[in-house]
Swiss-Prot record:
Keywords per UniProt: Cell membrane, Disulfide bond, G-protein coupled receptor, Glycoprotein, Membrane, Receptor, Transducer, Transmembrane, Transmembrane helix
Residue intervals on the Extracellular side: 1-24, 82-96, 160-178, 316-327
Protein name: 5-hydroxytryptamine receptor 1F
Glycosylation sites: N5, N10
Entry's Gene Ontology cellular component terms: dendrite; plasma membrane; synapse
Topological type in the membrane: Multi-pass membrane protein
Segments carrying motif NPxxY motif: 343-347
Organism per entry: Homo sapiens (Human)
Keyword Cell membrane: yes
Molecular functions (GO terms): G protein-coupled serotonin receptor activity; Gi/o-coupled serotonin receptor activity; neurotransmitter receptor activity; serotonin binding; serotonin receptor activity
Swiss-Prot/TrEMBL GO biological process terms: adenylate cyclase-inhibiting G protein-coupled receptor signaling pathway; adenylate cyclase-inhibiting serotonin receptor signaling pathway; chemical synaptic transmission; G protein-coupled receptor signaling pathway, coupled to cyclic nucleotide second messenger
Similarity section: Belongs to the G-protein coupled receptor 1 family.
Effect in UniProt of substituting W306A: Decreased binding to lasmiditan drug
Function per UniProt: G-protein coupled receptor for 5-hydroxytryptamine (serotonin). Also functions as a receptor for various alkaloids and psychoactive substances. Receptor for lasmiditan, a drug for the treatment of acute migraine. Ligand binding causes a conformation change that triggers signaling via guanine nucleotide-binding proteins (G proteins) and modulates the activity of downstream effectors, such as adenylate cyclase. HTR1F is coupled to G(i)/G(o) G alpha proteins and mediates inhibitory neurotransmission by inhibiting adenylate cyclase activity.
């Protein structure tokens, strides 16, 4: 998002020459991140469009998130790279206003999409039957529209407050001179969505864990009932078959060969039942770990990428004596942009349908 840059007009030619290698390295690194973000989000969008199996309301939210992150990559990152390398804004205040508008709106919209996806998954797990009826493309479209509208309402006021102060032609930043504007923008764009995401994913994990345990208990109970029925029917059917055979055996031999066979079968069936139950427990545990890993990656990436930036925004603009270097400000801004690269990876890498769709797209391009 916004950050402070200084002019390099006072630097000598020798100093500029010495700083050139580092500028080239920074430019190439950031350009590579922008290109990767553009490519990966393009793949997600294309996969959802061309793959009929992915035409699901839940994936429409992911597609909209990918579009938002794609806009960050093509409309926000390139201008930021030029600003960082040049160390001054050279494109005029009109372009500055447009860039800041797109920057704040798209980054806010990306964060709010994560909240919408969390809400969608929460309702799909906790109210599966009823929500399956409501989970239509129209419903997904309404959610996406609401996300964009809220993003605009959160993003626009800071831009109006920006013009209340004096701005230099060589800088493109938003100075939060009012505590109200700082709290409004940071809490609306991050802290409130963060709280919502944490609460929803905690409830999702608890609900998924409870659901796994209920299904496991139901399957074990069903197996025990079926096993008892099979055992009783087996005993009844074997009585008539074994009558003539048993009569031919000596009365002094209380244990017939058939009794031994029947005992062996029951023993094997019992062992098989316990083995099957153990395998189901192992699968259930694996699913729980996978669910926890997925949720951990989603929350971890989101918090690591955006929390430092918004802590900086809140502290620096509320505390007059608190300062931060230009390099650190740029780093925190790009750490937030990095979330637009990570989002499509996390939300699709655990989905087999997406993997197959990506493979088909790559083969077609090759």
């Amino acid at each position: 998002m916004d950050f402070l840059n200084s002019s390099d007009q006072n630097l000598t030619s020798e100093e500029l020459l010495n700083r050139m290698p580092s500028k080239i390295l920074v430019s190439l690194t950031l350009s590579g991140l922008a290109l990767m973000t553009t490519t990966i989000n393009s793949l997600v969008i294309a996969a959802i469009i061309v793959t009929r199996k992915l035409h699901h309301p839940a994936n429409y939210l992911i597609c909209s998130l990918a579009v938002t992150d794609f806009l960050v990559a093509v409309l926000v990152m390139p201008f930021s790279i030029v600003y960082i390398v040049r160390e001054s804004w050279i494109m005029g205040q009109v372009v500055c206003d447009i860039w800041l508008s797109v920057d704040i709106t798209c980054c806010t919209c990306s964060i709010l999409h994560l909240s919408a996806i969390a809400l969608d998954r929460y309702r799909a797990i906790t109210d599966a039957v009823e929500y399956a009826r409501k989970r239509t493309p129209k419903h997904a479209g309404i959610m996406i529209t609401i996300v964009w509208i809220i993003s605009v309402f959160i993003s626009m006021p800071p831009l109006f407050w920006r013009h209340q102060g004096t701005s230099r032609d060589d800088e493109c930043i938003i100075k939060h001179d009012h505590i109200v504007s700082t709290i409004y923008s940071t809490f609306g764009a991050f802290y409130i969505p963060l709280a919502l995401i944490l609460i929803l994913y905690y409830k999702i994990y608890r609900a998924a864990k409870t659901l796994y345990h209920k299904r496991q208990a139901s399957r074990i109970a069903k197996e025990e009932v079926n096993g008892q029925v099979l055992l009783e029917s087996g005993e009844k059917s074997t009585k008539s078959v074994s009558t003539s055979y048993v009569l031919e055996k000596s009365l002094s031999d209380p244990s017939t060969d058939f009794d031994k066979i029947h005992s062996t079968v029951r023993s094997l069936r019992s062992e098989f039942k316990h083995e099957k139950s153990w395998r189901r427990q192992k699968i259930s545990g694996t699913r729980e770990r996978k669910a926890a890993t997925t949720l951990g990656l989603i929350l971890g990436a989101f918090v690591i990428c955006w929390l430092p930036f918004f802590v900086k925004e809140l502290v620096v603009n509320v505390c007059d004596k608190c300062k931060i270097s230009e390099e650190m400000s740029n780093f925190l801004a790009w750490l937030g942009y990095l979330n637009s690269l990570i989002n499509p990876l996390i939300y699709t890498i655990f989905n087999e349908d997406f993997k197959k769709a990506f493979q088909k797209l790559v083969r077609c391009r090759c």
